[in-house]
Amino acid sequence: MDSGSSSSSSSSGSSSGSCSTSGSGSTSGSSTTSSSSSSSSSSSSSSSSSSKEYMPELPKQRKASCVVIDSESDSDNTSDEKNTTVCEISSGDETSDIDRPGGQKLPLIVIDDDDDGSPDLKNTKQKSDEPQMSVLEKEGVECIGSDSTSPHDVCEIWDVCGSSNQTSSELEPEGEPESEAKGEPESEAKGEPESEAKGEPESEAKGESESEAKGEMETEAKGESESEAKGEMETEAKGESESEAKGEMETEAKGEPESEAKGEMETEAKGEPESEAKGEMETEAKGESESEAKGEMETEAKGESESEAKGEMETEAKGEPESEAKGEMETEAKGEPESEAKGEPEPEAAKGEMETEAAMGEVETEAAMGEPEQEITAEEAKKKRAAYLLAQQRKRKRKNRFICMSSSKPRRKRRRADPQDGADPQDGADPQDRADPQDLADPQDRGDSQDMPSLPGTSDEPIPSGQPVCPRKGMASSRGRGRGRGRGRGRGRGRGRGRGRGAKAGK
């Protein structure tokens, strides 16, 4: 299609075919002027000879007379050259056609592929011109009384690029409307409207069809490269986000240190110019994976999985751990909205805050574990539990806002809640858990088990059914079951140890 379009578009730049209505002498003069003017492009003479070789049968095909477009209907500003005499060109009646069957007719149509150079392209373009004869014959044949050039009326066929080189300075304004009228349907049929629109002004300004062929190629190349670059960026961004979510799951399942997940999130948040909402989702997911990996390390070191739930709440609620350790409701209520406000516009800054506060929360949990039992009373436990419920509601609202992006998180937390539902009746039967410093998070876990069954109704509603959650679902389910068993065992061990310590402290 490119060869056809370039051939039709470049025909007038290289050749000004002119058939005159009066005898062979004037036609030979006009054809010599057309050939001399078309010799500005390097290979036009060779193409004229090749056109004689390859297409001597064109005059036979052109039995139909040319459809003539009146020059008044097309040209606006060349009022002096509007001789609206109508020339019908039929291939057998003129002496010029008999004298020069190949050379005279063919510059009208065939010498339009000079600038591309290679004869193979010429052959293909001339062959592609043969089925286009019906299109080309319907081009406007303007009969201009060109008194400045010859005393006879010269009929010139205007092609896509506009003016022929013979009278390019005079006739460019006439060539433009016709070329726009004709070039647009042809080039649209060939699928290159924008390249033709860009190529036209260039070729009219330069008088070269070469520039239009280059313009087409350049615009196509630019469009392809831009679309490829955008597509690559989008696919990379999507692949990164998916691989990041999968990487989170893997790091959580393996219990690797938080640094890997943190590196993934940071590089992705910096490398992706996608959106702040995605950044916020990343910070939430990152905080979750951090706290989970951290929680696993703590369960291995201390045998307690409650610190993991506390770590999640630390990273996402920012300031709740301190208030939990100290029992301050006001700072906690302030910390949560601040974190929510900061997390949206500044995911990077929120990430740093989450890391620092997570570290502070660890230190405080350790300090709280070392504290004697008498400091933590049942009232403080109730306050903390109420605060945790409030934080859970806020987090759920936030998640529902971005549920389309972080669609695997609610499923992950729902599965995380399932084993806790089985283990939480033991917490209710255990009277010492409220006051035990090591089991600070047990009342929160009870709050978790009370909250989470309401999650499926709220979280599954906004999720569209066609989201790519299905591959993550299997991974999350297997990982949730495995982690749930490990967490149950860890909590049992931690509780046993906590009871021992609590009994000693009580004594």
From Swiss-Prot:
Function: May play a role in DNA-protein cross-links (DPCs) clearance through a SUMO-dependent recruitment to sites of DPCs, ensuring the genomic stability by protecting germ cells and early embryos from various sources of damage. Can resolve the topoisomerase II (TOP2A) DPCs.
Entry-linked InterPro entries: SDr-like (IPR050972)
Protein name, per record: Germ cell nuclear acidic protein
GN (gene name): Gcna
Highest classification ranks of the organism: Eukaryota, Metazoa, Chordata, Craniata, Vertebrata
Keyword flag Nucleus: yes
Region (Disordered): 1-507
Protein's organism: Mus musculus (Mouse)
Sequence motif SUMO interaction motif 1 (SIM), location on chain: 12-15, 66-69, 86-89, 108-111
Single biological process term from Gene Ontology: homologous chromosome pairing at meiosis
Family: Belongs to the serine-aspartate repeat-containing protein (SDr) family.
Subunit comment: Interacts (via SIM domains) with SUMO2; this interaction allows the GCNA recruitment to DPCs sites. Interacts with TOP2A; this interaction allows the resolution of topoisomerase II (TOP2A) DNA-protein cross-links.
Biased composition (Basic and acidic residues): 122-141, 179-354, 431-449
